[in-house]
């Protein structure tokens, strides 16, 4: 359908984990509730909370003790991952009744393209129907954005919560989108916003009118792309397989001489981990899986991998995983070449860290991880965050992030 505009929905479940808990236990409805691990410990933190709790000042990442001080009647429940995965599967099943073009973004949000379906002539009514079904059949509230592309649909869904439906047309951008602070633009995190502000850009409208050369000099190829988005230009299609796309960032190093010296080999890994980390950060992506390569003096090559429980782009996390693999699989013979590769990459904006609720204080001291944690929770408050442990599932084929990984693997099998 050349020349025909697309009709894209972005479906975002409202306070998903808390909403699932209320659906499971009706006695919680209308009450201030929060999902947090280790609820009996003062150092437990809030993962997400109901709108009733938010109205009392409770926020994501807030320690339980502080939340209780603000809202003494706050009901705190532990997370139930199986329950959330089950509800998510049901949610996506409903969406697929309207179109095959459903792209999961995370366990609680996704895109739909209804352009070439019978529903295209009644987009708003279709959104109302979807929202009503999610509420009636699953007892889960949602917000839906309707727009001609994915970026605008995402921005639209954020405009009315909970239970909002918003249509955002390109002609409305000057009045609706451009006055917003640059920090509220999807795809722009705290660090990127700080950089952009050095150009005198404070609003999305400023970015839309910004100097493309200056943006490219500052942000690389991402600069012009962000300007395009600010102008409502985003050609990316809804792709049901996008979550499974395979990408990688890696480096290897050939030693000047064959070596079996642990300290020397550790030094090589240290440099490789730094290189991979810097490349991941430049690309603003994180790796969900890590491979190492060991080539011995006789040219025998061994490759081993592990799935990371949390996406990683920091040198220490990459180094920790690489050395764990090396320690387990090195046969003590002289080595000629070593390599590290991060795979199954996800954009930082979509990297959901699973919360280690027992070590939050330690995690919170870690920069820049703490900054990113705040950023992710501000934009995706319903997601769990945990500092970078690893799951020892060598040769596993799972993809995705945190417990979302299990969900997306199930989705792929359907």
Curated annotation (Swiss-Prot):
GO cellular component, one term: cytosol
Positions of the UmuC domain: 8-189
Organism from which the protein derives: Bacillus velezensis (strain DSM 23117 / BGSC 10A6 / LMG 26770 / FZB42) (Bacillus amyloliquefaciens subsp. plantarum)
Residues engaged in binding Mg(2+): 12, 108
Protein role: Poorly processive, error-prone DNA polymerase involved in untargeted mutagenesis. Copies undamaged DNA at stalled replication forks, which arise in vivo from mismatched or misaligned primer ends. These misaligned primers can be extended by PolIV. Exhibits no 3'-5' exonuclease (proofreading) activity. May be involved in translesional synthesis, in conjunction with the beta clamp from PolIII.
Subunit structure: Monomer.
PROSITE patterns: UMUC
The reaction(s) this protein catalyses: DNA(n) + a 2'-deoxyribonucleoside 5'-triphosphate = DNA(n+1) + diphosphate
Region ranges (Disordered): 394-414
Entry protein name: DNA polymerase IV
Places the protein is found: Cytoplasm
InterPro entries associated with the record: DNA/RNA_pol_sf, DNA_pol_Y-fam_lit_finger_sf, DNA_pol_Y-fam_little_finger, DNA_polymerase-Y, DNApol_IV, PolY_HhH_motif, Rev_trsase/Diguanyl_cyclase, UmuC
Enzyme class: transferase
Any single biological process term in GO: DNA-templated DNA replication
Domain of life: Bacteria
